[in-house]
Amino acid sequence: MSYTPGVGGDPAQLAQRISSNIQKITQCSVEIQRTLNQLGTPQDSPELRQQLQQKQQYTNQLAKETDKYIKEFGSLPTTPSEQRQRKIQKDRLVAEFTTSLTNFQKVQRQAAEREKEFVARVRASSRVSGSFPEDSSKERNLVSWESQTQPQVQVQDEEITEDDLRLIHERESSIRQLEADIMDINEIFKDLGMMIHEQGDVIDSIEANVENAEVHVQQANQQLSRAADYQRKSRKTLCIIILILVIGVAIISLIIWGLNH
């Protein structure tokens, strides 16, 4: 499944695509778990294991695609009025994606363990030593040499067949792919961790701005209070001056009136 970059820069469509992928990842994880439960039962078959591998790889690709979509969503331009709502939406998508990835990685690890157990059983039944064969040609040459020098020996438990080798190499290839996919998911978790960290920085910045705003408000209130006090004192002083002037005028008027009479 290939990644289709963007949806015309429309945040609503991009958010819908992300939500849809998250739902698919969750559903695929459930299906992978159901398939894992069938391994080692009468329903187990090479076809079932192939379906398991394909489903796992498809889900892994969905996870990579969703990671890119979320990054794109976070980089979309936004107006100040939309910023808060956009951040809430992104936080929700990141949280849902993290939950779905956690469940997916859990079944990934289970699948890898099942494959390793299968290889171990085949090796044990075929008397194959070592963990992972580095050179399959050596084992094939060994089988050929044993078949030529001991054609009469037909003890199945002590021989490794071509089918055994094929199964071992297929399963080991599957294990390596699973481990690589698990590492891919780990990288996505790191990306999500960085997003959460950046969101924390934004929150810290917002809180700092709020605190600064509160300080400025307090300072402004103090300045207003001082201004009000000054204004009250000014009015009081003005009233006293006016009163003195009135009294002075009255005294002068009385003196003038007395002189005239």
UniProtKB/Swiss-Prot annotation:
The subcellular location is:
Early endosome membrane
Entry-linked InterPro entries: SNARE, Syntaxin, Syntaxin/epimorphin_CS, Syntaxin_N, T_SNARE_dom
- Keyword tRNA processing carried by entry: no
Bilayer topology annotation: Single-pass type IV membrane protein
UniProt keywords, alphabetically = Acetylation, Coiled coil, Endosome, Membrane, Phosphoprotein, Transmembrane, Transmembrane helix
Residue numbers carrying Phosphothreonine: 4, 79
GO MF annotations, alphabetized: chloride channel inhibitor activity; SNAP receptor activity; SNARE binding; syntaxin binding
Top-level division of the source organism's lineage: Eukaryota
Just give the chief location class: membrane
Transmembrane feature ranges: 239-259
Coiled-coil ranges per the record? 47-69
Name assigned to this protein: Syntaxin-7
